[in-house]
Amino acid sequence: MVPMNNWRAVPKLTQCVRTLLQGGVIAYPTEAVWGLGCDPDNDHAVEKILRLKKRPVHKGLILVAASIEQLDFLLHDLEPEYYQKLEASWPGANTWLIPHKGRVSPMVTGKHATVAVRVSNHPIVKALCEGFGGPIVSTSANPMGLSAAKSQMQVRRYFAKEALSYATGVVGGRSTPSVIRDLYTDAIIRA
């Protein structure tokens, strides 16, 4: 296997990064399920993901990053104790709700004053974010009401008629998606 820090050596990852940069949608494995991703600053791409999933915009989406530094635009003014809490929990399957202060498109945040963020430890997710140069949208690859895809084949069945770029790889060892918590209250939104 090619080390994922050399994403340019993997043609499928190179194509996925190119798709992200051109405003397209990609499908890729994460820690527990396959995800759909795009450039969070491209409202047309985010809208396509919402349409594919039949997901209402008000629910919001997750941003996933390769490193905490990729999220600095959201974290630079956090109190030190909260920044340290994030550092201690990442990389890993911990998604946190943090205030976005208008720094993220409403297409991503939905009706919320917070945005869900995570630093992944999955090598393919990290490589995609590194190649793209920042965080990407991450949401399970399934239409609303159907189970999240666990394989590329299942994603292709769900979205057979859609033009998506597919990363090669398998999901990580987690049986469930990441836990989502509020950074300030520790309230669990999704276990």
From Swiss-Prot:
Domain of life: Bacteria
Locations listed in the record: Cytoplasm
Keyword annotations: ATP-binding, Cytoplasm, Nucleotide-binding, Nucleotidyltransferase, Transferase, tRNA processing
EC number: 2.7.7.87
Keyword Nucleotide-binding: yes
Presence of keyword Cytoplasm: yes
Single GO MF descriptor: tRNA binding
Record-linked Pfam families: Sua5_yciO_yrdC (PF01300)
Any one GO cellular component localisation term in the record: cytoplasm
Catalytic reactions of this protein: L-threonine + hydrogencarbonate + ATP = L-threonylcarbamoyladenylate + diphosphate + H2O
YrdC-like domain location: 10-191
Main location class: cytoplasm
Swiss-Prot/TrEMBL GO biological process terms: regulation of translational fidelity; tRNA threonylcarbamoyladenosine modification
Family membership: Belongs to the SUA5 family. TsaC subfamily.
Job of this protein: Required for the formation of a threonylcarbamoyl group on adenosine at position 37 (t(6)A37) in tRNAs that read codons beginning with adenine. Catalyzes the conversion of L-threonine, HCO(3)(-)/CO(2) and ATP to give threonylcarbamoyl-AMP (TC-AMP) as the acyladenylate intermediate, with the release of diphosphate.
PANTHER family: SUA5, THREONYLCARBAMOYL-AMP SYNTHASE
Name under which the protein is recorded: Threonylcarbamoyl-AMP synthase
Record lineage: Bacteria, Pseudomonadati, Pseudomonadota, Gammaproteobacteria, Cellvibrionales
